[in-house]
Design a protein with these regions (language model features):
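Sequence/structural signature of outer-membrane beta-barrel proteins
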Residues: 49, 60, 67-73, 87-89, ...
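Residues that define the transmembrane beta-barrel architecture of outer-membrane proteins
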Residues: 34-38, 45-49, 72-78, 94, ...
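Transmembrane beta-strand segments that form the barrel wall of outer-membrane beta-barrel proteins
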Residues: 30-46, 51-53, 57-72, 96-107
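Short loop/turn motifs that connect adjacent beta-strands in outer-membrane beta-barrel proteins
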Residues: 21-22, 27-35, 87-96, 129-136
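Outer-membrane beta-barrel proteins
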Residues: 57-59, 83-91, 125-130, 168-172
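Cleavable N-terminal export/targeting peptides
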Residues: 1-33, 172
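Outer-membrane beta-barrel "beta-signal"
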Residues: 23, 80-82, 157-172
Length: 172
């Protein structure tokens, strides 16, 4: 009899069905007529001058940025991220978007050359979205990797840092 109880409990739990009414599921706020699905453009993020590609989907905007840091060495940098429309303010899908990003956040002079520093963070953006273009202003807070020189001296600590960004993209 004691061997039957675990088996009964297993079958009772295995037959429970959960409906898809999770209150934390994201809401699809963007429609296909909000903007073109694919957009390309230019912008700057901190000291990174970049080209960017953006994918508009019902749940937000995914983006990839690739460019160079404008320092003496012009080393390459890239970022990827996603922004979810949190609060929309107009008939177009203009409004406040919250997002996450990861990639190169700054360039540091280490061992007589510049090195790109990896990091990640969250941001708040105001996005002007129309069928023809996407323009976004964002401020983010994130942290980068700890960087040391060849002697083990710490050049950059892992600590919070602000990131400012502006991009302008047009639909393709």
């Amino acid at each position: 009899m004691t061997k039957v109880y675990p088996l009964l409990a297993f079958f009772a739990l295995a037959n429970i069905a959960h409906a898809q009414d999770n209150p934390y599921s994201p809401e699809a706020k963007l429609t296909s007529d909000s903007a073109k699905t694919w957009n390309v453009g230019v912008g700057f993020t901190q000291k990174l001058l970049h080209l960017n590609a953006e994918w508009v989907n019902p749940y937000g905007i995914a983006y990839a940025k690739a460019g160079v840091f404008y320092n003496d060495d012009y080393n390459a940098g890239a970022q990827v991220g996603f922004r979810y429309p949190y609060y929309l303010t107009g008939k177009d899908k203009n409004g406040y978007y919250v997002g996450v990003y990861a990639g190169h956040i700054e360039s540091k002079h280490i061992n007589n050359e510049y090195e790109a520093r990896l990091g990640a963070g969250v941001d708040l953006a105001y996005v002007l979205l129309s069928k023809e273009r996407i323009s976004s202003f964002s401020i983010g807070i994130g942290a980068g990797e700890k960087m040391t020189d060849q002697y083990g001296e710490v050049i950059a600590e892992t600590e919070p840092m602000l990131q400012f960004s502006y991009t302008l993209s047009v639909g393709i």
